[in-house]
Amino acid sequence: MLFAVRMDVDIPRDLDPEVRTDLVAREKAYCRDLQKAGTWVHIWRCVGQYANVSVFDVEDNEELHRVLWNLPLFPYLTIEVTPLAQHPSDLAADDAGA
């Protein structure tokens, strides 16, 4: 199942700088591991914002929940999830039916 996920980040300004550095490093490592595993398919930065739009490929809602819940930045995220389905005008849909 594919999901588009928007994540807006709001790390408190008064968070200890060492804690912030560690948190961001762990988030980056977790993100890369999920990308290598094929779970985190795409990630795009939202220009001018501390936010991203990502696409996840997971078995079900529960797996997506676990993936998001385990993000080190999870306590500081506002998350919007949209389930995705293939669009009939997608060129890949034409190729699959050929």
What kind of region is each of these model predictions?
Residues 1-98:
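Conserved, structured core segments of small domains
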